[in-house]
C-alpha cells in the first residue's frame, strides 16, 4: 500500500532550498493523491472482491463457458451479465422450429377435422320380416303384429347411439298402429347394424269390412297395402339427428307369414326423406 520516498539532498542556497521545498510539497501531494486513489480502489475491491474458487466447493460458471467458477449453493443468488451479441441469446434453427410447430399444429387440426367431421347416417328399410295375424270374431277385428327390419349404417369415425325408433302403420290414410323403441343400441365407427322392430296394428270399427276380405276362404293370398313410416333418432357429441322413411308394403292379413328379406314384397312408392 505505502510507497517509500527517497531523501531529498540539501540545497546550498535559499532559492534552491525554496525550490526543493516546493518540489517536495508537490511530490508529497502527488504521493498522497496516489495513495488516496489506491485506497479508494482497494475499498472498491473490498466491496466487490474478485475471488477465484477452486476445489470441491465450486461449480463451473454457466455464463463464462467454464473459465470461471462460483461457490456451490450460490447459483440462485448470483447474476451473470451476458453480452447482447452472445450466440446463446440467438438460438439456432428458430425458424425451423417455428415452421415445424406450425406444421404439426396444422396436421393435428386437419386430422381432427377429418375424423370428427360429421358424416351421414344411412337408414335403409329392408322390409317386413314377419306378420302374425289373429281375429276377434265377435268384434270383427283383425290384429296384425308386423315385424320390420332396418339397416342402419354409421359412416362416421366415431360411435353413434340409436336413441329411439318411432314407427307407425297406415291403412287407407288411417293410422292403425304405432310403436316406439328407446335406447336401442350403439353403432361403432364405420359399422352397420340390423334392427328389428314390431308394430302392433288393429283393423276394426269403420274398417270392419276388411274382416270379411281377410277371412275369405276362396282367396289364398289376402294382401293389403300398408304404408310403413319410421323415424330413427341418433345422437353423437350431444347432437341429435333424425332420419325418416316411408314405404308401401304388401302384408297378408289372412295368415301368419314370414317373408324372405331381399325378395321384393313391397312397393317403393315414396322415396326416403333426405
Swiss-Prot record:
It is found in: Late endosome membrane; Lysosome membrane; Cell membrane. Residues 1-11 have a biased composition (Low complexity). The modification Phosphoserine is found at residue 33. Its main location: membrane. InterPro entries: TMEM106, TMEM106_C, TMEM106_N. GO terms for cellular component: endosome; late endosome membrane; lysosomal membrane; lysosome; plasma membrane. Glycans are attached at residues 145, 151, 164, 183, 256. Residues 1-20 are annotated as: Disordered. One of its GO terms (biological process) is lysosomal protein catabolic process. It is a single-pass type II membrane protein. This is Transmembrane protein 106B. It comes from Homo sapiens.
